[in-house]
């Protein structure tokens, strides 16, 4: 369910690399159960902004506020500790390993077999199948190679993994990039399911139609600056597309 109170706010975020200003006063807020789409063409500053939220980079100036408290995110561990998980385009999956091993990936449940500690495959596989079923994916076998899954299914595994391990704020970096129509539809359905769990989703994209399908709010970035934010229903495809391409400014985004 969507909350009225911001789960995370980023206020007036600046990031400079030497003399290059990558971000110039970017601000967004996101509530629990909300999908906030961050749109922009290549070079808009989306990747830098993701890395600040996920602790890879630290802002030159600005505030990060989590649950009403100003928070320092100095590294990826800090981000994880406050409930921020990022699913990058490469998904952090190992193609030749099983779906189950990819899902757990260093956090396996274990059991004792005599003096030896081993992965509890039965329990791990059972949880995996349950979590994937919640996301609308029926796996043939948890031991099958993750490389045998479609792109959309692999994306869903990465999202399900992040949610299972406690993500309250889920950052999705171009999750529908290079996917076909059917696979894209499945990923967008997965995002809806995640929102229903109360997880806040930050959907990074340059695809306006995909963003409009799931977004509650839309923020457009251009050359490191926020051009503004609009809620669903306040803006249409043509306006967003024109803003992203730099052809016009939108009064609704300036309000």
List where the protein language model places each region:
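Glycine-rich phosphate-binding loops of nucleotide-dependent enzymes
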Residues: 2-255
């Amino acid at each position: 369910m969507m909350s009225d109170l911001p789960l995370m706010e980023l206020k007036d975020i600046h990031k400079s690399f030497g003399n290059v200003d990558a971000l110039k006063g970017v601000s967004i807020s996101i509530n629990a159960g909300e999908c906030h789409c961050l749109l922009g063409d290549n070079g808009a500053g989306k990747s830098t902004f993701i890395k600040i939220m996920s602790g890879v980079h630290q802002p030159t100036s600005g505030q990060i506020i989590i649950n009403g408290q100003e928070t320092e995110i100095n590294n990826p561990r800090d981000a994880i500790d406050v409930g921020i998980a990022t699913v990058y385009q490469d998904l952090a999956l190992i193609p030749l390993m099983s779906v189950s091993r990819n899902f757990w990936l260093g956090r396996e449940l274990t059991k004792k077999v005599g003096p030896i500690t081993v992965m509890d495959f039965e329990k791990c596989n059972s949880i995996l199948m349950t979590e994937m079923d919640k996301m609308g994916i029926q796996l043939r076998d948890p031991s099958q190679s993750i490389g045998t899954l479609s792109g959309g299914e692999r994306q869903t595994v990465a999202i399900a993994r992040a949610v299972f391990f406690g993500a309250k704020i889920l950052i999705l970096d171009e999750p529908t990039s290079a996917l076909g129509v059917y696979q894209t539809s499945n990923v967008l359905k997965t995002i809806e399911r995640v929102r229903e769990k109360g997880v806040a989703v930050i959907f990074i994209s340059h695809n306006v139609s995909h963003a409009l399908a799931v977004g509650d709010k839309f923020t457009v970035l251009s050359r490191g600056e926020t051009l503004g934010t609009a809620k669903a229903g306040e803006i249409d495809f043509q306006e967003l597309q024109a803003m992203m391409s730099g052809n016009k400014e939108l009064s609704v985004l300036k309000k």
